[in-house]
């Protein structure tokens, strides 16, 4: 029976991804084209080509490994996990669908006498506890030792480093997997992990770095989803190193215009020792080309344009057994997709339990501790334009395949570079760019920010232009203080626009008041010590823009003249349905009937975009009479899919819609710099959410029908943590908690 697959948390992935699939990433292979011996002996400084490695294996039953272990013919690969997330990491690794790998998982604990011992973590069915002295573990001469470390490891690092040092000095491979903390966990924990990384450089052969902060920066994901993705990435790295080190699988080198050559196990070890760092990217598709594109563009762990790049490693997993001729087919497909002609090291992973016709591609980006100083002939200079080139070329193709897979109608609308300009009163609004990429991509450049940002927080100055090679994009909705945005056309108009109480109310949204999810009751927190604190926060936000009628009372003759002709006779049609009136407008102008992009009056505003049957369908923008703007996808005349709503006071919502209501995951960017991410159900926040205040405070918790409900975790600017209990928007209790709780 095929293993069930579930969608990953990456926002642009559409094909199911096996949530616990431990893909087998391999490691860098520096070589020249002279011969196998020269390839393996050259240093990373001499490497001048991109390497792509895959792994070919047939899954062996678990009994095979057990018999090998009993005979002593196959040593175990020991995995030691330390840090505050060790339990969840080991749970994820033990749920891996690759039981044939000779892995044993350990944690550090104390025995009855107070001495340190290693406690083995077994699968969920086996409740027996097995312990071992670290000296006994070293005497068993493990083939390799893998340390997985997250923040909060405490004194466990001392024993872990001692074991790593002993394993490496004994001639075996010592590998480290570092899981960096989220930025909201505080600078202290980040410095803690960085300090451990510096120590491990002296005691390990190879280190895999996993920065989980990018999960929250680049994707519309909850904290729980981000943690699961981070654990899956750790499991992938562990299984990859284990598969290579165990020697259970064949590895092949492919040189252009030559046959494949198989690598020996000792050669693989030499290869692994030649690099110091690696980063990961992976994707899933129903064909090899799509999975490769998604591994490059959709995985937040991989960023196109990395400068410390020495080699790329590709692993392709499928449910059908692949032979040597199939490996050549993969090579040919890879070269055609990536337009790459260099030497390649290639194979695949055979996993019978994987869903049929599913291809899982994993990239590993490897770098060396030695930094290249010359740009001439450097692999960096050759790779960055290469990645940017294929990025521009295949992004539209990937979006098209995704839309077809979802049953959406692909729409192609001509782009316009002047989409955000507002013309004078005697001109119409210029044709603007209606592209779903505007809903997905933002710039990372935020040096001009009006408000200071923490390290690692994304920012934005303007929308991306895919033709600009200096701009990076990672295919997911990003978030940043709204003060950094260059507003689209209509924003300057709405600042002085006189509110129109007509049909605009049908599509306009009410302004969200801060703090979010809190009932405006005078009795709120009257008996709590934090009453003054909440009152202070509320007072700081008592400005006119929270009043729906506050910021739009002053009218502008210029703004009124600009769109007066567009709205002159629309009030006469209010007795007609929206569909009938829009069809009449389309028929009155014969020149517009044959245009793929229509401009018409629609439900109290000016719509410009794709239409079908007189109703918006596809991509389009609606400028409402009160100055608010919706820019995004439409279906049957209603907002559906990805879209951005610009409030008349400067706030912005960016996320998913259904039947004219916010439905799904989305971000609110308040124009004062606060940010709020939440899951929405029919227009109301429901489920997990998080709030980032401009002052640096962070709130995590759950919402119910738009109100805070249940437990909330609050982290102040100085790192102090508070646990709050809310009941339908009313604060019940608040107490300080320890950082380790």
UniProtKB/Swiss-Prot annotation:
GO CC field: chloroplast outer membrane; chloroplast stroma; cytoplasmic side of membrane; cytosol
Disruption phenotype annotation: Small number of abnormally large and heterogeneous chloroplasts sometimes exhibiting alteration in stromule length and frequency in non-green tissues (e.g. slightly increased stromule frequency in hypocotyl epidermal cells). Normal shape and number of etioplasts in cotyledons. Misexpression and mislocalization of ADT2. Formation of multiple MCD1 and MIND1-containing ring structures in dividing chloroplasts, instead of single ring. Slow trunover of FtsZ ring subunits (e.g. FTSZ2-1, FTSZ2-2 and FTSZ1) in contractile rings at the chloroplast midpoint.
Subcellular location: Plastid, Chloroplast outer membrane; Plastid, Chloroplast stroma
Pfam families: MORN
Annotated consequence of substituting residue 632 to A: Impaired interaction with CDP1/PARC6
Compositional bias per record (Basic and acidic residues), positions renumbered to this chain: 451-465
Extent of the transit peptide: 1-41
Chloroplast among keywords: yes
Effect of residue 641 to A: Impaired interaction with CDP1/PARC6
GO biological process, one term: plastid organization
Topology of the protein relative to the lipid bilayer: Peripheral membrane protein
One Gene Ontology MF term: GTP binding
Ranges: MORN repeats: 612-628, 630-652, 653-675
Subunit structure comment from the entry: Self-interacts. Interacts with FTSZ, CDP1/PARC6 (via N-terminus), MIND1 and MINE1. Part of a complex made of ARC3, ARC6, FTSZ1 and FTSZ2. Recruited to the middle of the plastid by CDP1/PARC6 where subsequent complex made of CDP1/PARC6, ARC3 and FtsZ proteins can form; this complex enhances the dynamics of Z rings during chloroplast division. Binding to FTSZ2-1 is enabled by ARC6.
Name of the molecule in the record: Protein ACCUMULATION AND REPLICATION OF CHLOROPLASTS 3, chloroplastic
Species name: Arabidopsis thaliana (Mouse-ear cress)
High-level lineage: Eukaryota, Viridiplantae, Streptophyta, Embryophyta, Tracheophyta
């Amino acid at each position: 029976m095929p293993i069930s697959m579930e969608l990953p948390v990456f926002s642009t992935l559409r094909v199911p991804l096996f949530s616990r699939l431990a893909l087998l990433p391999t490691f860098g292979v520096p070589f020249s084209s002279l011969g196998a011996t020269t390839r393996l002996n050259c240093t990373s400084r001499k490497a001048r080509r991109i390497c792509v490695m895959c792994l070919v294996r047939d899954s062996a039953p678990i009994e095979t490994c057990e018999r090998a272990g009993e005979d002593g013919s196959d040593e175990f690969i020991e995995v030691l996990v330390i840090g505050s997330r060790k339990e969840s990491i080991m749970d994820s690794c033990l749920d891996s669908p690759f039981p044939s790998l000779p892995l044993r998982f350990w944690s550090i604990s104390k025995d009855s006498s107070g001495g340190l011992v290693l406690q083995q973590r077994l699968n969920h069915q086996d409740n027996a506890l097995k312990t071992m002295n670290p000296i006994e573990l070293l005497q068993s001469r493990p083939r390799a030792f893998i340390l997985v470390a997250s923040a909060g490891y405490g004194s466990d690092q001392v024993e872990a480093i001692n074991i790593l040092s002993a394993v490496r000095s004994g001639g075996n491979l010592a590998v480290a997997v570092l899981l960096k903390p989220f930025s909201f966990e505080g600078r202290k924990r980040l410095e803690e992990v960085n300090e451990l990384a510096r120590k491990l450089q002296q005691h390990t052969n190879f280190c895999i770095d996993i920065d989980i902060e990018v999960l929250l920066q680049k994707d519309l994901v909850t904290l729980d989803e981000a943690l699961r993705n981070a654990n899956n990435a750790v499991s992938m790295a562990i299984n990859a190193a284990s598969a290579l080190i165990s020697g259970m699988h064949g590895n092949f080198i492919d040189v252009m215009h030559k046959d494949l050559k198989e690598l020996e196990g000792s050669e693989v070890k030499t290869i692994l020792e030649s690099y110091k760092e690696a980063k990961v990217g992976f994707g899933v598709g129903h064909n090899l080309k799509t999975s490769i594109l998604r591994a490059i563009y959709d995985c937040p762990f991989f960023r196109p344009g990395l400068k410390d790049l020495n080699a790329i490693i590709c692993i392709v997993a499928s449910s059908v057994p692949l032979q040597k001729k199939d490996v050549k087919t993969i090579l040919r497909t890879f070269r055609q997709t990536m337009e790459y002609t260099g030497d390649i090291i290639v194979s695949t992973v055979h996993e019978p339990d994987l869903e049929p016709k599913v291809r899982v591609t994993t990239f590993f980006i490897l770098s060396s501790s030695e930094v290249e100083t010359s740009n001439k002939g450097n692999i960096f200079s050759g790779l960055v334009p290469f990645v940017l080139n294929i990025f521009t070329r295949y992004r539209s193709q990937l979006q098209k395949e995704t839309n077809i897979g979802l049953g959406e109608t692909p729409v192609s609308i001509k782009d316009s570079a002047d989409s955000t300009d507002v013309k004078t009163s005697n001109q119409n609004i210029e044709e603007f760019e209606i592209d779903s990429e505007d809903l997905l991509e933002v710039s990372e450049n935020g040096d001009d920010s009006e408000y200071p940002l923490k390290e690692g927080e994304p920012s934005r100055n303007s929308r991306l232009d895919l033709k600009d090679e200096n701009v990076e994009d990672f295919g997911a909705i990003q978030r940043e203080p709204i003060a950094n945005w260059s507003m689209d056309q209509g924003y300057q108009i709405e600042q002085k626009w006189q509110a129109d109480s007509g049909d605009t109310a049908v599509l306009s949204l009410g302004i969200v008041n801060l703090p979010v999810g809190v009932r405006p009751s005078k009795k709120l927190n009257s008996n709590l010590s934090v009453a003054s604190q909440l009152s202070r926060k509320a007072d700081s936000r008592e400005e006119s823009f929270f009043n729906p009628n506050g910021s739009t009372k002053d009218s502008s003759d210029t703004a009124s003249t600009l769109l007066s002709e567009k709205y002159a006779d629309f009030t006469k049609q209010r007795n007609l349905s929206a569909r009938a009136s829009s069809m009449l407008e389309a028929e009155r102008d014969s020149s517009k009937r044959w245009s793929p992009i229509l401009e018409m009056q629609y439900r109290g505003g000016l719509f410009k975009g794709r239409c079908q049957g007189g109703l918006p369908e596809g991509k389009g923008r609606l400028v409402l009479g009160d100055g608010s703007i919706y820019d995004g996808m439409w279906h049957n005349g209603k907002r559906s899919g990805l879209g951005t709503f610009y409030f008349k006071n400067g706030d912005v919502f960016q996320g998913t819609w259904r039947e004219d209501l916010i439905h799904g995951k989305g971000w609110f960017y308040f124009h004062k710099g606060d940010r709020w991410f939440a899951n929405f159900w029919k227009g109301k926040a429901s489920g997990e959410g998080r709030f980032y205040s401009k002052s640096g405070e962070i709130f995590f918790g759950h919402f119910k029908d738009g109100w805070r409900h249940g437990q909330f975790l609050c982290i102040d600017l100085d790192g102090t943590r508070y646990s709050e209990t809310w009941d339908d928007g009313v604060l019940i209790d608040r107490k300080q908690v320890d950082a380790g709780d």
